[in-house]
Amino acid sequence: MEKPFELAYTELKKGCFPEELSFRTTAEIKPLEGVIGQERAVKAFDFGLAVKMKGYNIYMAGPSGTGKTPYERNSTEKLAQTEPVPYDWCYVYNFQNPRSPLALRFEPGQGKQFKEDMAELVQLFKTELQKAFRAEDYETQKNTLEHSFDEKRDALMAEMSAVAEQYSFQVKTTNAGVFFMPVVEGKAVGEDEYDDLSEDVKNKIEKNSQMVQEKAGSIMRELRDMDKESKRQTDQLDYKTGMFAIGHHVNAVQEKYQEYERVISYINAVQEDVLENISQFVEEEEDGEDSLASLLPMLGKKPAEDVTLKYKVNLIVDHSDSKGAPIVVTFNPTYNNLVGEVEYDSEFGNLTTDFMKIKGGLFHKANGGYLLVQAQDILSTPQAWEALRRVMKTREINMDSIREQLGAVVAPTLKPEPIPANIKVIMIGSSYYYELLNEYDEEFDKFFKIRADFDYEMPRTDENIRKIAQFIKRFVDREGCMEFDVSAVCAIVEYSSRTAERQDKLSTRFNHLAEILCEAVTWAKLEGAELVTAAHIQKTIYEKEQRMKLYEEKLDEMLEENVIMIDTEGAEIGQINGLAVLDMGNYAFGNPSRITATTYVGKSGIVNIEKEARLSGQTHDKGVQIITGFLGQTYAQNFPLSLSCRVCFEQNYNGIDGDSASSTELYCILSSLAELPIRQDLAVTGSVNQKGEIQAIGGVTHKIEGFFDLCRKRGLTGTQGVIIPVSNVKDLVLKDEVVQAVKDGLFHIYPISKIDEGIELLMGLSPGKKNKAGNFPANSVHGRVMKKLKAFDKRAQGEEE
């Protein structure tokens, strides 16, 4: 057997050394501007900001901590400062349809000015109208008008009385109108006396009554017409007087806002309503302090402020102090927070509202600018996505109540006029949320036409290493903390590479790096150091791991006490050491696991015990099926594959998924069939395809370190090691203690590309090559396996016969 190829210690990690950098401390370099390693995302995002057409909202996808939010804020703020300030918006009373307040648009700052101008105008209405209607000239005109009609009324009443008297009737005037009372023997007769009269007298009265009603009818019509004319002329006088008093003030306001056609129309409507309701401005209070009305306001007149309520202005968007386009960030996108709401007052159990209780939402604040939201917040808040998609689709802000959206019965409410929306929505979230929204809403692509994908890693180039140093400098300047020396920067670069799990990559999850920087500064302070060094970085990483490795230590204890059985010496048939990664959320570690296989005569094929126990995931099940394909392709070309096999991850109670153990399981099955023992001082990881090629897997660094830690605690023998796919060599970023053990020849890492390479390493026997007849050498591993499978097939056929 030839000596197997193994990796040199120099291939197990890629170091970063101070001589590679051109500074001694971060004090000598400039802080970072922008983001690192996100060229594709930056290009997409900047293009999305530049497109102003409908549907070009932006979804920023990628894992947290890659710089999405800071870049979004910085880029958006820079652009927003160069863009125009959007319109102010006001809601005002709708005199034609009070249930639908009108939305008025103004240039920035003019909304606030209009509100003040209208308040001042209404105050002028009060003072000028009271002055005009208390003036002597008005009183003279009104008295003259009233006197003229009084004379005419008296003349008509006298004529009516004469007609009534002619037929023995008397005219009586009450609040209810004009009545005719019969006169008998010079005395007016009431209802009681009328019943006592004789029938002849009654008949005469009835006859005369008809005559009176007939002749007095025309006079009554004249009286009614005269009263109407009196009111018309009085109203005309009031209108003329009121117009003279306030018209020039109204004209002044209209002239100020002459460019706004809808505002002019609204002011005209205000003027007409005021002139039609002049009495509410000029009548004096009649209720005293002790009146019932003062004790129970709901039974008396409305408070004075209610008189002018409908002339007020509800300014819901004010940009008087704004510079550039607005940027609104929300982490609580409830329906009401987004679209706004109409508030209510409760008065004696009744809900009341008016247009002044309309409250603008985040859409109103962001209109003409940018709304920044988190996908998770939108998806976890009821009706938030529906509100957002409706604004993006209709380009209107419609303030429907959430109860209406849910179909609930609500109290009568207002229907404010929708406001045109011009909002660029920028949503931040993971790729998972993007796919979820895309699946959930078939129009999602129409709303978010730009996707900016932020990568979790970047190439390990000199330029990116320099930018990481600048990132550290930016952290130092922002936090006002001590500087980092060049060794600390090198340690951070190595940590970044380890986080990316690639020798040729660096992590872009800078929130993780920032945590290390923050804690390293603290350790340096506790030691009284002047600079943060590599030792502080290493201590930070060590202490961080110690805080989170309780579960790992519990497993280690069970391994040491042989509660969990793993052999690291000797050899066993049908038994092998597999490797898995346990992910605890913010901490992951490698964990060795014993895998066993048993084979016997039968036709049930390979049975995955994990699957039978419902502890296996779909990807692991697929890996088991691939093993069946390999066995059939390799051995069963000339006879049927008659085999029963059970494969098990021993002492696994938490479930397993992934195909990274498929090669390991295959070795175990081959060992059982060939009756050849497998070395227990080696652990194996790697996926296999149906052609026997070893494929890359994830978490190779953690897996190696997990088996190494177990071997080190039990004592390194010099023969122990791990078999990995050759395609994973670039992923190795091992700890220094593993690198040193390999350097000292105490631990070994074997990269392989074919299943046959692992067979020879594990079983110490040549796998054998198939000849033209389709057979393997008898004393090879494959030959022994084929012999056993043929024997199984014969027995199976014999049992059938």
Feature roles, as predicted:
Residues 1-438, 443-461, 465-486, 490-526, ...:
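Conserved ASCE/P-loop NTPase catalytic core
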